[in-house]
Amino acid sequence: MTESSLDLQESGWEELRREARKIEGDLDVKLSSYAKLGARFTQGDTDLVMNYEKVLKCVLVSGYVDTGSPTVGSGRSWKSMEMEIQSLLEKLLDINDSMSRCAASAAPTTSVTQKLARHRDILHEYTQEFRRIKGNINSLREHAELLSSVRDDISEYKASGSMSPGVQVLRERASIHGSISHIDDVIGQAQATRAVLGSQRSLFSDVQGKVKNLGDKFPVIRGLLGSIKRKRSRDTLILSAVIAACTLFLIIYWLSK
């Protein structure tokens, strides 16, 4: 056993790695459950949208309402799971920092450096996945809570029995919802166009750079390009002189008549 390996064992490297692998396994399980919870929120949001459109149509056409729309969950399990995952990510970050200090104090080998980099990559992947799922769930919950407020408006309408202002509010809500969907489509198209233009710009820049490098590497080609440019300039001057002479000849001919 090498001296570097002994130093790593004495500094607790293997113990830290075991703890890191355990937390990584726990994170994998909890992130999977968290993603399934996000999928349930997606289904709930879709049901709310469909129910909202059905209720709105009934109110505007016949005045009949059915308030049996689904409710938004309390979110306790969602919030608890989110806090657990956040805590595990912070612990894994601390362990990775400890592993880095441990490896640095014992002259790490290539194998140790690769293992440390792998643990960092896993932490980065889990962090990005957690942020993505969290953002989706928050967005869906906000959307669902907004749509669930329609039930309150409908209940007030049934209690009052009047067509205004409840119906007007529902109409405005439907108009706003349609406008938001249209704006989202326009923004998506603009982002796609921007990405295409950016890729084309990068492609043209690469081509220009390659041509320049080719000219620098091969003087013969650079000289040939220069000759073509000079010939083009000479042809342009000759053509300009011919046009000027013809114009002058026409002016003299017109004045002499």
Curated annotation (Swiss-Prot):
GO process terms (BP): endoplasmic reticulum to Golgi vesicle-mediated transport; protein transport
Organism for this UniProt entry: Arabidopsis thaliana
One Pfam family hit: V-SNARE_C
Chief place of localization: Golgi
Cytoplasmic compartment spans: 1-235
GO cellular component, one term: endoplasmic reticulum membrane
Signal sequence interval, chain numbering: none
Protein name, per record: Golgi SNAP receptor complex member 1-2
Disulfide bonds: none
InterPro entries found in the cross-reference section: Golgi_SNAP_su1
Highest classification ranks of the organism: Eukaryota, Viridiplantae, Streptophyta, Embryophyta, Tracheophyta
Gene name, Swiss-Prot/TrEMBL: GOS12
